[in-house]
Design a protein with these regions (language model features):
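Alpha-helical transmembrane segments of multi-pass membrane proteins, especially transporters
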Residues: 26, 74-79, 169-170
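N-terminal transmembrane-helix/juxtamembrane module of multi-pass inner/ER membrane proteins
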Residues: 1-51, 91-104
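Membrane-embedded catalytic cores of phosphoryl/pyrophosphoryl-handling enzymes
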Residues: 101-210
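Alpha-helical membrane-inserting segments
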Residues: 4, 8, 36, 85, ...
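Hydrophobic alpha-helical transmembrane segments of polytopic
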Residues: 52-59, 79, 140, 144-147
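Membrane-interfacial segments
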Residues: 11-16, 67-68, 92-97, 135, ...
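Membrane-interface loops
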Residues: 18, 56, 60-136
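Membrane-helix interfacial "entry" motifs
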Residues: 30-41, 63, 67, 71, ...
Length: 210
């Protein structure tokens, strides 16, 4: 969160990119070619509408079906809250998009922090927390890390975000998902009533035999 606050302060003082922003943008742009253009323009759509939203919807329905109310509340709160934080930050900070070359997939709203970076990171961070005590956790972490980095790369490759927009989006998303986790505690469950009944029955049998 401190990284996000520091970047936000710099953005308030300087609406353009940071010194290392332009260097990284130009370095990524050097590898630009038609095939990569198509790949990046397609892949970037999975950062929100083609990927994050469908996956979040399916998982929400599964949690609803399983009556995992805390987990469902956690997932929805983190994702919807992430959108609200992103929209608010963009309106308050008014950071313009990079203008180093003509993008094949232009964006016209404000840049800081990156919505795609926030959406992808929020989803993966939330899933890591939800699967923390299961065998799925490492798989989610591994695949999710590749996904998050890939989405971040597409935003830079397409020239629609400064690298600091991406970094800020990641940092605030991690802080947000952890904070909501501490509040909602999605892993907190009530003791199993079935187990309680079994224990009571065992006790009664022990008394009868005694």
């Amino acid at each position: 969160m401190l990284v996000f606050e520091e970047l936000a302060l710099v953005v308030l003082q300087n609406q353009g990119g940071l010194p290392w922003d332009e260097t990284l943008l130009l370095a990524v742009h050097k590898i630009a070619q038609p095939q990569l253009d198509v790949f990046a323009a397609t892949l970037t759509k999975f950062g929100v509408f083609w990927g994050v939203f469908p996956v979040a919807t399916v998982i929400s329905l599964v949690l609803l079906r399983l009556k995992k109310w805390r987990s469902l509340a956690y997932l929805l709160t983190t994702l919807l809250g992430s959108i609200l934080i992103n929209r608010t930050a963009k309106l308050l900070l008014h950071r313009v998009r990079p203008n180093l070359w003509e993008s094949i997939s232009p964006e016209f709203d404000y840049a800081f922090p990156s919505g795609h970076a926030m959406s992808s990171m929020t989803l993966i961070a939330a899933l890591v927390i939800l699967t923390w005590n299961s065998n799925w956790c490492w798989l989610v972490l591994a695949v999710g890390s590749v996904f998050v980095l890939a989405i971040g790369w597409t935003r830079i490759y397409l020239g629609v975000h400064f690298p600091s927009d991406i970094l800020a989006g990641w940092m605030v998303s991690i802080a947000w998902t952890i904070g909501v986790n501490l509040l909602i505690q999605p892993h907190l469950t009530k003791p199993s009533t079935v187990r309680e009944d079994e224990l009571t029955l065992d006790e009664e049998e022990s008394i009868a035999q005694g």
